[in-house]
Swiss-Prot record:
The keyword Oxidoreductase does not apply. Coiled coil: none annotated. One of its GO terms (molecular function) is structural constituent of ribosome. Belongs to the bacterial ribosomal protein bL34 family. Keywords: Ribonucleoprotein, Ribosomal protein. This is Large ribosomal subunit protein bL34. GO terms for cellular component: ribonucleoprotein complex; ribosome. InterPro entries: Ribosomal_bL34, Ribosomal_bL34_CS. The gene is rpmH.
Amino acid sequence: MKRTFQPSVLKRNRSHGFRARMATKNGRQVLARRRAKGRTRLSVSK
């Protein structure tokens, strides 16, 4: 049986990367929440 997680850096960054987050209002809210919480890594790409 094929596993569900087939890693790809490109797909990962396109959907969850910093620029993808900045592209939408909700994505910016995600980053703001993570900054407020004090996360070292705001997104997977950064």
